[in-house]
From Swiss-Prot:
This is Segregation and condensation protein B. Belongs to the ScpB family. Keywords: Cell cycle, Cell division, Chromosome partition, Cytoplasm. One of its GO terms (biological process) is chromosome separation. Participates in chromosomal partition during cell division. May act via the formation of a condensin-like complex containing Smc and ScpA that pull DNA away from mid-cell into both cell halves. Transmembrane segments: none annotated. It comes from Staphylococcus saprophyticus subsp. saprophyticus (strain ATCC 15305 / DSM 20229 / NCIMB 8711 / NCTC 7292 / S-41). It is found in: Cytoplasm.
Length: 182
């Protein structure tokens, strides 16, 4: 087992994000046997990261020792405004849910992982695993409804309404602080 294989495994899981990769995908991409994959995972040693096994899926995660620091970072970031990419992704999810990350990228025409991770970290969007799909589907949360002061998704402005009203509706989120969870 080469050091290069460990790096490739880490890069693959990092790229896959919180959806991870299942064992079969890893075996095919790395062109290795199951025992070699097990050895690679057991030998993986990073000061801040670990490989978690959930069912048949492997995910690169942070180690528990870093959780307090990560919480501080998330708290600081949640007080910051949403980026334009996050706003676009949020509106796409709100109007078209459920969607996968790849659906959002197809609509936006650009990688949206960072924006989606921000929305999930702020509690505005959640990823749910669908029984008939290997990918997670993205949905808005109750917090999303609360932030916008609506009770149901049906209360979102429709595209039949003025574009300014829709723009104003979503620009409210830019001014929201992440700690308004009431």
């Amino acid at each position: 087992m080469a050091l290069q294989d460990k790096g490739i495994l880490e890069a693959l899981l990092y790229t896959a994000g919180d959806e991870g990769l299942d064992q079969q995908q890893l075996l095919e991409i790395l062109e290795i046997e199951p025992t070699t994959l097990t050895e690679l995972i057991e030998a993986y040693d990073s000061p801040g990261l670990t490989i978690q096994h959930y069912g048949n899926t492997y995910v690169l995660t942070t180690k528990k020792e870093a959780s307090d620091y990560i919480e501080q970072l998330i708290e600081q970031k949640s007080k910051m405004k949403l980026s334009q990419a996050a706003m676009e992704s949020l509106s796409i999810i709100a109007y078209n849910q459920p969607l996968s990350r790849s659906d959002i990228e197809l609509i936006r025409g650009i990688n949206s992982d960072g924006a989606v991770k921000t929305l999930i970290a702020r509690g505005l969007v959640e990823a749910k695993e669908e029984a008939d799909s290997r990918s997670h589907q993205l949905y808005t949360t109750e917090l999303f409804l609360n932030v916008f002061g609506i009770e149901h998704l049906d209360d979102l402005p429709t595209t039949d309404e003025e574009d300014e009203e829709i723009e104003a509706f979503f620009s409210n989120l830019v001014n929201q602080k992440g700690d308004n969870h009431e």
